[in-house]
Design a protein with these regions (language model features):
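Conserved ATP/PPi-binding loop(s) of AMP-dependent carboxylate-activating enzymes
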Residues: 380-384, 396-429, 457, 468-474
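Gly/Ser/Thr-rich phosphate-binding loop
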Residues: 154, 298-301, 311-374, 386
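N-lobe entry segment of adenylate-forming
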Residues: 1-57, 61-76, 161-178, 197, ...
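Conserved AMP-binding/adenylate-forming core of the ANL superfamily
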Residues: 46-91, 95-99, 116-121, 226-229
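AMP-binding/adenylate-forming catalytic core of the ANL superfamily
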Residues: 115, 122-123, 132-134, 410, ...
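Conserved adenylate-forming
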Residues: 73-79, 193-207, 211-253, 350
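Conserved AMP-binding/adenylation subdomain of ANL enzymes
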Residues: 232-250, 258-299, 312-314
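AMP-binding/adenylate-forming catalytic domain of the ANL superfamily
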Residues: 157, 531-556
Length: 569
């Protein structure tokens, strides 16, 4: 019997037609994140888990190293439920630490490397962390923290720890550091647990595994508590998605572990699928391009900044790729067409796949997939995810194609913000269906085929006055999507500033093609704006910028652009 179409996405769930019955009916795993990757790799112990600058670590070695780390943590007094703060990149040691803590039921609290010493101290205190682990590259901050918090146990990591010996020697010669201080070296730390015996802590539903933080582009960063169930739900759903993931595939990971995406997609997903995770730490675009050429990954995930650099550089052959996907900022349709055209010219048979998510849902709920792709959209929901578009004013569900706030009900939605029930209740709400839905603060729509389209942030809609003195809504994203069509514009971000006469006005920051006369290009873009935008949306000023500021989560940092505007104008 054919299912009746109601016209409401969350009831019809049209995206399920793309999935197998097995994917729809599959039970989600009930185990810790460590138990999950162990179960998935029982017959893959000789396979490569990590590839770090040519040092290839098998799954057998990988699990042994995790056990050593777990024993060392137990030796220094870390127990189930304890929190350990980590300021590091995705080195092998960092990954052992995350899963080693998970083995004994402790929680990895992942903080941004860019935080100041005082911010990290405040974080350690607020989370009641029992230990602090940090990279040698922030050693001065580390020493300041040790001085301020003399009772906390500290462990110093070096990015060269797992490099092949010849690279390690070269790195240490080039980066001589004063290693004096109270912190354990990783080697000495491991030695503490040599005679200790620990067992895996039994699985408890919704037990926390990691804490990651929102990027803070819309306010003070909040601690997002992700459980074992959340992270495993992402990996399990992707295993049923239409990606050609195979055990032994090379997955190039450039995403820092202090991002939700870095933990769920960068680290946990490839290990859960038995892939070889090629770890690359330097996110300077040209260095990423060089590494990409050398590694030749089958799967690669990044953001528009890196993607643009890759395509601007001379990468001739991309036939080896099966998945080329991205997150963070979105491309306009024009940019997406250009990217796909260039990719096809280089031998990649698919399309650049974009997705949608937020830190609060392990950074992913929707994604494009090979063969399931629609230009200008963010793909379809994962098989266990439901999406609802609601009217921001009355909370009523919108029909196909109608704009509203994007809401999700999913097994990968966080357990809550750390020690912040009020903010948790503001974003996760129980609807009349009795289910808990996360309210994203984003506007979008779902079409009859199940594809999600992003329209913009609710908070980034402003009021302005037109020349006729009428009040209009001002949408920065609308302006950006038009300006990027101009042949001289490479990147564009619009900020909105208060104005006594017009309430608010738009200011467009533009990275233009190199070598153009600034006055001429500014005038050309302004003329283009007047031709292609309604009068009230024409930017008051075009500000040319040599390089866009980006957050560590690969989003244009509009706060810095606002600061720059205030300082200069």
């Amino acid at each position: 019997m054919k299912k009746e179409i109601t016209g409401y996405p969350s009831i019809d769930r049209p995206w399920l037609k793309y999935y197998s019955e097995e994917a729809i009916q599959a039970e989600l795993p009930e185990c810790t994140i460590l138990q999950y990757i162990k179960n998935k790799n029982t017959n893959n112990l000789s396979g490569i888990a990590l590839n770090y600058f040519g040092n290839r670590i098998t799954y057998r070695e990988f699990f042994k190293n995790i056990d050593k780390v777990a024993k060392a943590f137990y030796a220094i007094g870390i127990r189930e439920g304890d929190i350990v703060t980590i300021a590091s990149m995705h080195t092998p040691e960092t990954i052992y630490i995350i899963y080693g803590l998970n083995k004994i039921g402790a929680v990895a609290n992942m903080v941004y490397l860019t935080l100041s010493a005082s911010e990290i101290i405040e974080n350690i205190k607020s989370t009641d962390s029992k230990a602090f682990i940090y990279l040698a590259m922030i050693q001065e901050k580390g020493k300041a923290i040790e001085k301020e918090l003399p009772d906390i146990k500290t462990i110093l990591l070096d990015v060269s720890n797992s490099m092949p010996w010849y690279l390690k020697c070269a790195y240490k010669l080039k980066n001589k550091k004063d290693i004096s201080g109270k912190a354990y070296s990783f080697k000495n730390f491991l030695s503490l647990g040599e005679d200790v015996v620990v067992k895996d802590i039994p699985y408890t539903k919704n037990a926390p595994a990691v804490i990651v933080y929102t990027s803070g582009t819309t306010g003070v960063p909040k601690g997002v508590v992700l459980s074992n169930d959340n992270l495993n739900a992402v990996a399990e759903q992707y295993s049923y998605a239409m990606f050609d993931f195979r055990m032994g595939d090379v997955f190039m990971d450039i995403i820092p572990p202090f991002l939700g995406y870095g933990i769920s997609i960068g680290i946990h997903l490839p290990l859960a699928l038995g892939m070889e995770s090629a770890l690359w730490l330097d996110i300077e675009p040209k260095k990423v391009v060089q590494a990409f050429k050398r590694i030749k990954p089958r799967h690669f995930v990044s953001g528009p900044v890196i993607v643009n650099q890759m395509l601007e550089n001379n990468i001739k052959d991309m036939k080896f790729l099966s998945t080329f996907a991205g997150g963070g900022e979105s491309f306009s349709i024009e940019q997406e067409k250009k990217v796909n055209s260039l990719l096809h010219d280089k031998g990649y048979s698919g399309n650049y796949l974009t997705g949608y998510g937020m830190t609060e849902c392990c950074a992913t709920v929707c994604t494009g997939m090979p063969g399931i792709y629609k230009e200008g959209t963010l793909g379809i929901p994962l098989p266990k995810v439901n999406v609802k578009i609601v009217n921001p004013k009355d909370g009523q569900e919108q029909r196909y194609g109608e704009e509203g706030e994007i809401c999700f009900h999913a097994p990968n939605v966080m357990t809550g913000y750390f020690k912040n029930p009020q903010e948790t209740d503001n974003i996760i709400k129980t609807h009349t269906d009795g289910k808990k839905w996360i309210h994203t603060g984003d506007l979008g729509s779902v079409d009859q085929e199940g594809f999600l389209t992003f329209h913009g942030r609710i908070k980034k809609i402003y009021l302005t006055k037109g020349n006729d003195n009428s009040v209009y809504k001002l949408f920065p994203m609308q302006i950006e999507n038009e300006l990027i069509k101009n042949e001289d514009v490479l990147e564009c971000e619009v900020i909105v500033v208060p104005d006594q006469e017009k309430i608010h006005v738009a200011i467009a920051f533009v990275r233009a093609k190199v070598g153009l006369d600034e006055d001429i290009v500014r005038e050309k873009i302004m003329k283009f704006s007047r031709t292609h935008l309604p009068g009230h949306a024409v930017p008051q000023k075009i500000v040319l910028i040599e390089k866009m500021p980006y957050t560590q989560s690969n989003k244009i940092d509009y706060k810095k652009l606002e600061e720059k505007y205030r300082e200069e104008f």
